[in-house]
């Protein structure tokens, strides 16, 4: 079994097993040096709809072999029991652990009625079954706009929140289109994209409006935290290998 936040050493034919998810919807498995996979538009993610990226643009199947970018032979240490699971945990704690999703007002925010604006900031929304990597459709009491006249298709991005004709909302995700004609009432800040990605069907979302300065500060803090985590993991691994004469 593979526990969260641990560094483990594996040998050929070892089987890794994960327990059921407790928090979130997705787990991340990293290997030393990274996987040697096909990149598409600068990403190693797999787009199943157009069969691009990742491993031949498809889901992984039993017996698939993913090559590594960097091969390291730790076999001399694998016989030592204490080397199988290294005695330290990656610290992924982050000061900003709120469950709220911060949003910047979109171009058409002011087209919402006063009541709809209040509902957006005070009512929880629910991720519905009609959700995928292109977008999350949300279950909510219908919101309404004063007017949608004069709208033309405009640029959208990861985290754009659009108001659909039935008053429901959709939050665009990683595989979003590039333009959209529905009102863009808001944009989820970049630092909270990962929170969105961990939501699953039935999960609630609480939105809160913020400003550009706060969004930039949170993104900077997040990037610094991830860089520190990466450097700490590299340092601890090198330190452990040196200690064992490798």
Stretches with model-predicted labels:
Residues 1-246:
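Conserved "landmark" site that anchors the functional core of diverse proteins
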């Amino acid at each position: 079994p593979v526990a969260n936040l641990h560094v483990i050493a594996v040998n050929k034919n070892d089987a890794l097993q994960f327990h059921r998810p407790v928090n979130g919807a997705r787990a991340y498995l990293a290997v030393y040096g990274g996987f040697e996979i096909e990149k598409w538009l600068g990403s190693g993610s797999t787009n199943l709809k157009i069969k691009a990226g990742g491993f031949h643009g498809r889901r992984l199947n039993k017996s698939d072999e993913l090559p590594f970018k960097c091969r390291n032979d730790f076999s001399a240490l694998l016989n030592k029991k204490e080397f199988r699971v290294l005695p330290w945990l990656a610290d992924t704690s982050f000061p900003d652990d709120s469950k709220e999703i911060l949003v910047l007002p979109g171009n058409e925010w002011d087209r919402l009625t006063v009541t709809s604006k209040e509902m957006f900031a005070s009512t929880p929304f629910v991720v519905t079954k009609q959700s995928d990597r292109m977008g999350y459709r949300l279950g909510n009491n219908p919101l309404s706009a004063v007017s949608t006249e004069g709208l033309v298709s405009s640029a959208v991005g990861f985290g754009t929140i659009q108001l659909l004709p039935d008053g429901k909302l959709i939050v665009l995700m990683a595989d979003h289109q590039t333009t959209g004609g529905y009102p863009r009432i808001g944009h989820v800040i970049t630092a909270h994209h990962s929170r969105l990605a961990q939501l699953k069907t039935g999960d609630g979302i609480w939105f809160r409006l913020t400003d550009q300065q706060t969004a930039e500060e949170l993104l900077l803090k997040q990037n610094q935290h991830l860089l520190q985590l990466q450097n700490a993991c590299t340092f601890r691994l090198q330190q452990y290998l040196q200690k064992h004469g490798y």
